A protein has these predicted regions:
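Glycoside hydrolase catalytic-domain context in secreted enzymes
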Residues: 1-167
């Protein structure tokens, strides 16, 4: 009855959960996901990178690709298959509480750097022992919340939607 676990922190815990799943009547492996927005930072002993807004200041797509690739390798070593990153919301209000998770305010840069990170995580088809599934977040216009309040209403004109969020 359980199909996935979030934030499993050790390989031993992941192996135990997989063992339980494989001994169940359906024998379907469990999908394990973790929020690895700047490396697999929730897991002890893994590489922790600067927050995405800091990484974006490099303007170096290949650097974000390599971070995605290394993070995927460390995630798989601890039993995870799926990451809830990158955040490709376009930063529109610096008061927003998720600024650090974003890749900035420039749609071109966010698109390129987000794609590089996704490609690093998945390395083409995301099958294999050193690749993970990237879950891009959030919704279009997520960085447009009124007064910078997370999950608040957004007032987005068609022009802003087309020029900023759907270039």
């Amino acid at each position: 009855k359980i199909g996935s676990f979030l934030h499993v922190l050790t390989a031993q815990e992941a192996n135990y959960l997989q063992e339980l799943a494989l001994n169940s009547p359906l024998k379907i492996p469990v999908l394990i996901g973790i929020d690895a927005i700047h490396g697999n930072a929730l897991v002890s002993g893994t590489t922790v990178y600067p927050s995405p807004i800091g990484l974006a200041s490099t303007w170096d797509d290949s650097f974000l690709y390599s971070i995605g690739k290394q993070t995927a390798k460390e995630m798989r070593a601890t039993g995870s298959h799926w990451t809830f990153t990158p955040n490709i919301d376009i930063l529109r209000d610096p008061r927003w509480g998720r600024v650090g998770e974003t890749l900035g305010e420039d749609p071109f840069m966010v698109g390129n750097m987000g794609a590089a990170m996704i490609n690093g995580f998945q390395q083409g088809d995301f099958t294999g022992t050193q690749k993970v599934i990237a879950c891009v977040k959030h919704l279009i216009g997520g960085g447009e919340s009124i007064n910078g309040l997370n999950a608040a209403a957004a007032d987005i004109s068609v022009r802003t939607l087309r020029e900023v969020h759907l270039p």
